[in-house]
Amino acid sequence: PPSLFSFVVCSIDEEKFAALSRTIATRFAGMPHEVIRIPDAASLCEGYNRGFARSRGDAVVYCHDDIDLLAPDAAPRLARHLTHPDFVGVAGATRVTGPAVFWAGHPWLHGWVTYHAPGDADYEVTAMSLDAPLVTEVAALDGVFVACRRDAAAAVPYDEATFDGFHLYDLDVSYRAHRAGFRLAVACDLGIVHESKGDFGAEWSRYAARFRTKFPELSAAQGSPHFYAARVPTAADVLATQRRLAEIAAGQGRRIPARTP
């Protein structure tokens, strides 16, 4: 397992950062870790590159500040998942055809992410597919949570010149990593919860145009990025629902083994 996990977080929100720090301290209590906060990032790319330069870990985790990890053993699970892949996210696609991680649509989308904004009565448990617990041969990762080996992160820095805002940073870096021959995977068993589903407004469109300019060959029509969801009242119900999904996936022989080097 990694000897040190370095979490790099761009956060201007004291409350969110404090909550995330508590989550990391709890889940990674048995593993050496550090949390590097960038409170004044010019962009996510700039902040992540600056945070990486300050980090010391042989495993680096880039994540948003509005997440939770419900699985009690999320840390050892993540450590196991990093045995073979170079990058491990929680949602992604095995095919890239346009300016969004999930642009290709099904059947290429994977990941189990739960959504729960402050004040929500219920948790929305979603599943992109029944491939679990680790999906390999991935070509792009959503940036909500991405863990990677240090050498891989060093080889593929974030493009802060092109993506000088808060959109497309994740698709760009993960797709370049995939094209460079690094191994990407999606972990479905960390119990991740995210407060936000993302914003695809005018700012996203501006950076989508930059992505199209950088990768003109990715010009396919958008596929269907639908997902399936169940609303449950508690965090315990989230984990119970995901355990049931895992049982169904295993029963259908849908477990995708990690690829050996």
Regions found by a protein language model. Give the residues of each.
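Glycine-rich, basic loop-to-helix element that forms the pyrophosphate-binding segment
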Residues: 41-55
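Short aromatic/hydrophobic "clamp" motif used to bind/position activated sugar donors
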Residues: 60
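A recurrent flexible, glycine/aromatic-enriched loop bordering the glycosyltransferase active site
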Residues: 123-148
